[in-house]
């Protein structure tokens, strides 16, 4: 029996750190990093123009929902800094969600609005929400980089946010009346991926790759 899978495409800064955290989330089956969102064909690391560094995630929707992936995405990168993550500057490091269908677009818009309304971040959420275009797979040396080089560069970590559930519940009720859905991934402790990989809070460790 063939397993039903879905795909998500996200950009949130250097793809090394993004992949290292997202690949360990329960229900994620496969990830690969690459370049998307721009207009340079056959993009490479040395020539990707205005593409973003991005990650393609294949997941089992019976285990994890697209909404939950987005919630975790908003927890592991700063969506309020235009074209920047940590030490990394430029459009390659922008925050973006590339949806593959209208349902994903609606979920992305709802999730981004809920994060913005919660004031969990000091600034306004600037995450771009755009239709997915061509995804150019990155070179082999960029795939699973931190799995191969555990002490390599990363600016991504799981934020331990203060009482996000309570704050977001208020915003959900305010925005949607009885349509409240728990903001399940943003919890103050016991993040689900920790059970699989012992995820820790890492700061920027090395100069830009």
Curated annotation (Swiss-Prot):
EC number: 1.8.4.11
Name of the featured protein: Peptide methionine sulfoxide reductase MsrA
Function: Has an important function as a repair enzyme for proteins that have been inactivated by oxidation. Catalyzes the reversible oxidation-reduction of methionine sulfoxide in proteins to methionine.
GO biological process, one term: protein modification process
Residue segments, region Disordered: 183-209
Compositional bias per record (Polar residues), positions renumbered to this chain: 199-209
NCBIfam families reported for this sequence: msrA (TIGR00401)
Active-site residue numbers: 14
Signal peptide, first to last residue: none
PANTHER family linked: PEPTIDE METHIONINE SULFOXIDE REDUCTASE, PEPTIDE METHIONINE SULFOXIDE REDUCTASE MSRA 2
Listed GO MF terms: L-methionine:thioredoxin-disulfide S-oxidoreductase activity; peptide-methionine (S)-S-oxide reductase activity
Top-level taxonomic group: Bacteria
Main enzyme class: oxidoreductase
The keyword Cytoplasm is assigned to this record: no
UniProt record similarity statement: Belongs to the MsrA Met sulfoxide reductase family.
Reaction(s) the record says it catalyses: L-methionyl-[protein] + [thioredoxin]-disulfide + H2O = L-methionyl-(S)-S-oxide-[protein] + [thioredoxin]-dithiol; [thioredoxin]-disulfide + L-methionine + H2O = L-methionine (S)-S-oxide + [thioredoxin]-dithiol
Protein keywords: Oxidoreductase
